[in-house]
UniProtKB/Swiss-Prot annotation:
Stated role: Catalyzes the conversion of 1-hydroxy-2-methyl-2-(E)-butenyl 4-diphosphate (HMBPP) into a mixture of isopentenyl diphosphate (IPP) and dimethylallyl diphosphate (DMAPP). Acts in the terminal step of the DOXP/MEP pathway for isoprenoid precursor biosynthesis.
Listed Pfam families: LYTB (PF02401)
Record-listed dimethylallyl diphosphate binding positions: 41, 74, 124, 226-228, 270
Domain of life: Bacteria
Family matches, as InterPro entries: LytB/IspH
Organism of origin: Hahella chejuensis (strain KCTC 2396)
Protein name (database record): 4-hydroxy-3-methylbut-2-enyl diphosphate reductase
Catalytic residues identified in the record: 126
Amino acid sequence: MKIKLANPRGFCAGVDRAIEIVNRALDVFGAPIYVRHEVVHNRFVVEGLRTRGAVFVDELDEVPDGALVIFSAHGVSQEVRQEADARGLKVFDATCPLVTKVHMEVMRYSRDGRECILIGHAGHPEVEGTMGQYDSANGGAIYLVEDEEDVGRLIVNDPGNLAYVTQTTLSVDDTARVIDALRQTFPEIKGPRKDDICYATQNRQDAVKELAATCDVVLVVGSVNSSNSNRLRELAERMQTPAYLIDGAHEIQPDWFAGAASVGVTAGASAPEVLVQQVVQRLRELGGEAPAEIAGREENIVFSMPKELRIPAVNQS
């Protein structure tokens, strides 16, 4: 059985930065460090940080006075920021800069009194944070839609003064259909100059399409609460290729590969490469050949760290 590895796969720049912020905060300030929500949606990563002394909480009222808190990569609402400020908490913001870009768009629409539609999944932390950037005091409102059916049911106050933004980890194809529905329903709607779906989401979806087209089975390494990982599994399944979302090699079932000549492996943007390599090792134990990397789009984006957590340059003499 051939093993093919998607490229790119796994960690994106925003996830790398968020995890590094927690690790460096632990190095500099010591445990405990409080993190609002899972810093990224991956069980292996979260458990590793918890072992080092990170304490994951749902809300700020679980954070003691005077403690240090980190906001997750998914971002937080203005209300959460204001609560942290009011309590005098020391904050490091691990919000992905590409999520922050969407936040800035929403705040601009809010200031201008333009109504805004967010395309996203209800209940996802990124969606809650983005919705929470909109201040309706200027007379506008923000609405959430997930699919074309939601668009058909949507009633807005001012169709002539309307814009849309999107969650960064959506299915590219699904989102395009929702945007088409929005444009048909609200012909004057404005959109971002550049798509809000992030480069890593796009690249990983392109790569899994290639896997699904050439493999009999696809494995997606990622946790069940990871939006972008779920989209990868769904995309492979839509191409009529059996696909499984797994947290690690221990979840692999040998009967998935009955009659399969090839298996493709990819990983969501919050899944570390060590898990991919463990999956490959398990597949080889089940008779898989040495893995082959599929050519893909190179990624070299790096996001900067907060100043207090940057490693000082070594003096050259």
